[in-house]
């Protein structure tokens, strides 16, 4: 029984550490950029869009498609950063599971 109690305590401790890491990640802002930084997207670690900035040079009513492509590029850049940070942050817990 003592072994099971220790496992439960370890699991609870890990859960608290994971929750703390998730909260820290959610509070972090990631900045994704398109080519030449013409579109910049800011997202939180929990993948909420905070801000999107367009350089004057990219705002052309006759070429909306380029603006759309650059926006997607900036968002995907930020999302990739979030995924990497999540793997790094949460991957640390994988080897610590008591079972």
UniProtKB/Swiss-Prot annotation:
Location(s), subcellular: Cytoplasm, Nucleoid
Annotated Gene Ontology cellular component terms: bacterial nucleoid; cytosol
Signal peptide boundaries: none
Chief localization: cytoplasm
Keyword Metal-binding in annotation: no
SUPFAM superfamilies assigned: YbaB-like
GO molecular function: DNA binding
Domain of life: Bacteria
UniProt keywords, alphabetically: Cytoplasm, DNA-binding
Function of the molecule: Binds to DNA and alters its conformation. May be involved in regulation of gene expression, nucleoid organization and DNA protection.
Subunit structure: Homodimer.
Recorded family membership: Belongs to the YbaB/EbfC family.
Protein name per its UniProtKB record: Nucleoid-associated protein stu1598
Species of provenance: Streptococcus thermophilus (strain ATCC BAA-250 / LMG 18311)
């Amino acid at each position: 029984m003592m072994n099971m109690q220790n496992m439960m305590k370890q699991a609870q401790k890990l859960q608290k550490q994971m929750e703390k890491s998730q909260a820290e990640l959610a509070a972090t802002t990631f900045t994704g950029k398109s080519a030449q930084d013409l579109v910049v997207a800011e997202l939180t670690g929990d993948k909420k869009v905070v801000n999107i900035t367009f350089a004057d040079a990219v705002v052309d009513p006759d070429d909306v498609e380029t603006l759309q492509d650059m926006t997607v590029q900036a968002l995907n850049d930020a999302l990739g950063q979030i995924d990497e940070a999540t793997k790094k942050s949460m991957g640390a817990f994988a080897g610590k599971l008591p079972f």
